[in-house]
From Swiss-Prot:
Pfam families assigned: SH3_1
Record function comment: Plasma membrane osmosensor that activates the high osmolarity glycerol (HOG) MAPK signaling pathway in response to high osmolarity.
Gene Ontology cellular component terms for the protein in this record: cellular bud neck; HICS complex; mating projection tip; plasma membrane
GO molecular function: MAP-kinase scaffold activity; osmosensor activity
InterPro entries: SH3-like_dom_sf, SH3_domain, Sho1_SH3
Gene: SHO1
Protein name per its UniProtKB record: High osmolarity signaling protein SHO1
Length: 330
């Protein structure tokens, strides 16, 4: 089992993402470790040139100090795996550092002293790294360049909130207007209204044993089922001891097996970026091959409901697939 699969499964089991200190978060990302190494070397060259220079501009000294602060923040954020939470801060910070480094480079590059020339070379290297960081942290994880860069990381491609939001906004149109490939794949759409299950239904995954699932328990031990019919549709809600409406994994899969048309329950088309082998101890995961086309639904969380061409349903890690806007082009 790959590290990405193990980490994704741990995130599914726990409703809250835990962030632990690990050098692997930094070392396992070639982009982060390479750019940080170059910036560290450039910063040391700049610092050495500034110390040896008799007349170093005060503005340049502040630029050197600010660059050091941003590099420390970069390391801390990566070690605690908080990049997605502080992308805006990093983009803004390296933008300010880019202004300092470029201005200092322009002031020192025309000086005759070799020490100042060394300082200008260091500032030039820092400017290049800062520009690369601005493009990376200023873009969403779904950006083509970011996806290509993250594909070399051990943790794989990062989840994109923007991509999920855009897909959700198109869901109504996708359900109302069946596409040719989807129609041929599943036999067409018959005009059902969309039934949407929020990703909050994924909470409570501690019950991973299919034999103890209470989705359709008929015995006296199973929780009481309520059938809510507000708009002519049937939705099953499991009563819990604390009175909330969260369901177990068996309940949510039961929803998809009994609620009718597949295109309503799985309105999106996804293409597998990598092959994935389901955990044999988890009956709700499904395996798929690289390049395989799947129908998916409830794309808010890190684990999505999915259905394969052979009718097999289950859950898949979202960072192993990408949504396809035009299934007819596949």
């Amino acid at each position: 089992m790959t590290l990405r699969a193990t980490k994704a499964r741990q995130q599914r089991v726990s409703p809250h993402i835990g962030h632990t200190f690990s050098f692997g978060n930094l070392v396992g990302d070639p982009f982060a470790i390479s750019t940080l190494s170059i910036s560290t070397i450039a910063w040391l060259i700049t610092l050495g040139g500034g110390i040896a220079t008799k007349k170093m501009p005060h503005f340049s000294w502040w630029g050197i100090a600010f660059q050091f602060v941003m590099m420390v923040c970069f390391v801390v954020i990566y070690l605690w795996d908080l990049v997605d939470y502080y992308r805006g801060f990093l983009a803004a910070g390296v933008g300010v550092a880019f202004v300092y480094s470029t201005n200092s480079c322009s002031q020192l590059i025309y000086q005759e002293e070799p020490q100042q020339a060394a300082g200008s070379a260091g500032f030039m290297m820092l400017s290049i790294v800062n520009m690369i960081w601005m493009f990376y942290f200023g873009a969403d994880n779904a950006a083509p360049a970011n996806r290509w860069i993250d594909s070399f990381s051990i943790r794989g491609i990062r989840a994109s909130q923007v991509e999920s939001s855009l897909a959700l906004a198109r869901s109504q149109k996708a359900v109302a207007s069946p596409q040719p490939a989807a129609t041929a794949f599943y036999g067409g759409l018959e005009g059902h209204s969309q039934k949407y299950v929020s990703s909050t239904a994924l909470n409570g995954f501690e019950n991973t044993d299919p034999h103890t699932s209470t989705a359709f328990a008929l015995g006296p031990e199973g929780p009481t089922q309520r059938n809510l019919d507000t708009h002519g549709t049937s939705t099953y809600v499991t009563d819990t001891t604390n009175g909330n409406t969260e369901t177990t994994m068996g309940d949510t899969l039961g929803l998809y097996s009994d609620m009718g048309d597949e295109l309503v329950n799985f309105p999106y088309t996804a293409k597998a970026l990598y092959a994935y082998e389901a955990d044999a101890s988890d009956a709700y995961e499904i395996s798929f091959q690289q390049g395989e086309i799947l129908r998916v639904g409830d794309i808010e969380g890190r684990w999505w409901k999915a259905k394969k061409a052979n009718g097999e349903t289950g859950i898949i890690p979202s960072n192993y697939v990408e949504l396809v806007d035009d299934p007819a082009a596949l």
